[in-house]
Amino acid sequence: VTLCFVYGLKSIWIPWLWPVFNQIFLAVYLSTWLRRSNVLTGAEWIRTRFGDDRGGRLAHIVVVAFAVIAVLGFLAYGFVGVGKFMEIFIPWEVVSPYVPFNVPVEYVPHFYGIFFTSIATFYVMLGGMLSIVWADVLQFTIMTVSAVIIAVLAMMHVSPEALQAATPEGWANPFFGWTLDLDWTGLINEVNDKVVSDGYSLFSIFFMMMLFKGILVSAAGPAPNYDMQKILATRSPREAALMSGFVSIVLMPIRYLMIAGFAVLAIVYYQELDLMTGGRIDFENILPAAMLQFAPVGILGLILAGLLAAFMSTFASTVNAAPAYLVNDIYKRYIEPDAEPRRLVRLSYLISVLVVVISTMIGLWVESINSVLQWLVSGLWGGYVVSNVLKWYWWRLNGMGYFWGMLVGIIGALLFPPLFAGVI
């Protein structure tokens, strides 16, 4: 919602950073290739590519390391996001009298993040794959109904003339020149600072790099996280391809009905929103503030339930990826091959808790949601791309080459933020 608010229709290109079109590559051939292996995890799949020699084992271990780092990054991202989101709906002034210790204003989102992450952790440990699937189905149904209602409300309360008067020239145009050319001066001056801090002013150069990087990331296949686990959990290679193909077709129209609806309502009625956090305007609070201000009674609860269900299912899928790799690919393979199932289950519980605690500690140092997202999609995935493109398409790449390529990429991703502060 924040991206649509600030960049208008040009924001449709920014998700290419992830990239959203990787589902095309998965649907056409990559999901089928992966599912035919009949393995349980992405790290285990690496051994089918490079064998069981020294290079194959090192490649296997480095994929596990990458998967765990990615899990920590995504959980820190979710921790910061859910904290800022819930701060809007549960005002600190109401909660603080019941908290037996002092929490500085700037750390209130972190307090909420810790609270809701703890609840989600118990859900992960008590639930299983079936609960995640049903939670996904339930939250999608809720969000579909909510998205249609919000889109209709936006159409009823925002006229084209009012939207045009509240936005800068070019906001409604998806196309662009060398520069972004969006000047919010005289409308909402603070948005200009947001554009500068995001670093998207030279939009053509940014777009070309984003497109090139997106094609490479898509060709590299899914990272060893819950996306790959869902592909490997499908019934057959055909269903794996169908699942990947239907994701964008089903999800995108519903998602953008709600995004665009809240964005235009927030722009036209901007003065009615409370975006202050710790004494400053935080544009990452646009979605919860717009929900609180514009969603009718009843619909607000429906949307909130759907978004929390989405957080819970995504959180559960992400957390479950860590014990899957560490228990199945490290402990069971190298430490205790004959371990009893009960012991493996208990170890999975322990690893799940440790992963959540570590990611929460990382999240305490994160200043914004966007900074974590940029590191994940630019830093960590940048280090992942080259080795994983070559593993599919260059038959001469061996396990040692893959291992060293991944290791250098991971180290570079970890060192880049502290060495080049402000770049990511």
Where are these regions (language model features)?
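Membrane-embedded helix-loop-helix hairpins and adjacent transmembrane boundary segments
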Residues: 1-424
